[in-house]
Amino acid sequence: MFDPKSLDSGSRSILTMKNRLVSWAWALTLMYMLVSLILPIGALLQKSSQESVSEFVSIATAPVAMSAYAVTLSSALIAALLNGVFGLLIAWVLVRYEFPGRRLLDAAVDLPFALPTSVAGLTLATVYSDQGWIGTWLSSLNIQVAFTRLGVMLAMLFVSFPFVVRTLQPVLQDMERELEEAAWSLGASPFNTFLRVLCPPLMPAMMTGIALAFSRAVGEYGSVVIVSGNIPFQDLIAPVLIFQRLEQYDYSGATVIGTVVLLISLTLLLAINWIQASNRKFLG
């Protein structure tokens, strides 16, 4: 067994210094988490807990709030699933193929990270409005995107897209092509090769990317408020409803609705993390 007394004074000084550095690192980490994450969430929960149970339930289950939850969660889920499919395709192309403009396309994937969400919303509204480049053509087909629920999903697609691609790329880069070639040589079809050889190692990363995309879409405000009509019971989402409550100085309503969205998001993320852990155990 290791005995600190067996060390000379110089070694004990080094060991003591390392322990202090570790302690300081832990203290700084906890302080950062406390200030940036735990305190704001705690303040929100504390503010909403000041309401009585009946008042909390009344505000949280108001028809306009229930509609906003439904629009937010359903639109975010559809956007995340679509990004899961097309994000996988784009990540596959970027990793497995060389073509002119590949680096430019790879850099463009990160554009939603750098672009202000208000600029993204303005761009989408300009392009998909009735007088926009694409909106004009869609209008001839009686399809309206801007200032509708489709606009909400489009904005969520835009801001959450990079999460899936960037989560899948490292996994695809680490996968050996020899596994695919071996499956093909044994007579497996491309579909069976994907389903039995590629899908198992990709599934945890895919679910992580979809979860991150969903979380990002649920919290989106800047682009949605511009590209949607923000009409209750139609395309009003929870973050915009919270802001409307703040504009009306209804702080109780804003905190209660914010708490509900927070709890829903945390519950879904915990469920997804549990599924990921189960998949890892199943895959060994």
Curated annotation (Swiss-Prot):
- Name the GO cellular-component terms: chloroplast membrane; plasma membrane
InterPro entries of this UniProt entry? Answer: CysT_permease (IPR011865), MetI-like (IPR000515), MetI-like_sf (IPR035906), Sulph_transpt2 (IPR005667)
Alphabetized PROSITE patterns for the sequence: ABC_TM1
Has UniProt tagged this entry with the keyword Chloroplast? yes
Query: Which keywords accompany this UniProt record?
Result: Chloroplast, Membrane, Plastid, Sulfate transport, Transmembrane, Transmembrane helix, Transport
Q: Does the keyword Chloroplast apply?
A: yes
| GO terms, molecular function | ABC-type sulfate transporter activity
Top-level taxon in the UniProt lineage: Eukaryota
All residue ranges annotated as the ABC transmembrane type-1 domain in the record: 69-272
Membrane topology designation: Multi-pass membrane protein
Membrane-traversing stretches:
25-45, 75-95, 107-127, 145-165, 194-214, 223-243, 255-275
UniProt-annotated location(s): Plastid, Chloroplast membrane
User: Can you tell me which family this protein belongs to?
Assistant: Belongs to the binding-protein-dependent transport system permease family. CysTW subfamily.
Its recorded name reads: Probable sulfate transport system permease protein cysT
Q: Which organism is it from?
A: Nephroselmis olivacea
